Amino acid sequence: MNANSITDKQRLHFALLFTAAFLVSIWGVFIIDSAFELGLNVHGNRPREIRGLKGILTYPFLHSGIEHLWNNTASFFTLNALLFYFYRSLAVRVWLIMFFVSGALLWLIGGKGNHIGASGIVYGLASFLFVSGVIRNNLLLLRISLVVVFLYGGLVWWMLP
């Protein structure tokens, strides 16, 4: 075995560590906001409003309630773990691009109002996993693409107005 090779167990550990780190942060924000009634949701992404620019960075951490948070958690856990497991060398870069681009696009073209939740990242993860699996001509990654379409294909309907 090559000194630079990585075992499946190490890949899984890496994937779960990065996934858990983000989930702990969004759950932590939700619990603190709920416990102390801070009203943090006003800091969401408000498209085309100067005061909404900070929301590009904050909106994925804010959720309207436990059901909203749970729905984002379940999808995020699966898709993010797949990204970090199968695309280890690209994962951090892809994730950061999705984080910033989803927030910026929402600010530029989103509907009026205050947008909160990690759905933009979830849509980005699903899109990347699907497209990457199709264009890489790799049977395993193509299978992952099909799983993503099967499990999350309905996400596209939530993006349309």
Regions found by a protein language model. Give the residues of each.
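A detector for small-residue-rich transmembrane helices and their helix-helix packing motifs
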Residues: 2-161
